Amino acid sequence: MAIATLGPVVIDCPDPLALAAFYAELLGGEVKADDPTWVDVTGFAGTPLAFQAAPGYVPPEWPRADRSQQFHLDLMVEDMDAAEERALALGARKLEADDRTRSWRVYADPAGHPFCLCRG
């Protein structure tokens, strides 16, 4: 028997509102910002996301064995090329996305967190 349910995945960042807007656009969600240091993104299929201000935030580096990425999000998409175009237009950057034969591509969000666009 479970003792808990999963709430939102909370992501540290320097600008919660900006990063929430990025993911809301990618996922088709809605930004809820009652406090500028904590911003929620809801209204899309899947686990909700929350973004919290982190003073002194240092983004992860990809790939780097001596400094872990700590987590990444797998975002399931129908059209990899269209999703990549949209993600890049919203401020993502490519990390490992040149091999078009794989079923995933790795990017960084505007705050530097890695995420994957996955065919699915």
Regions found by a protein language model. Name each.
Residues 1-20, 26, 71-77, 118-119:
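N-terminal beta-strand motif that seeds the catalytic metal site of vicinal oxygen chelate
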Residues 2-8, 14-16, 33, 40-41, 49, 68, 73-111, ...:
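Vicinal oxygen chelate
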Residues 48-49, 60:
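Short, charge-rich, low-complexity interaction segments located
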Residues 36, 44-46, 66-70:
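Short connector loops at helix/strand junctions that flank enzyme active sites
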Residues 27-28, 91:
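Glycine-centered loop/turn motif at secondary-structure junctions
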Residues 56-62:
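A short, acidic/glycine-rich surface segment
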Residues 44, 52-56, 120:
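Generic beta-structure capping elements
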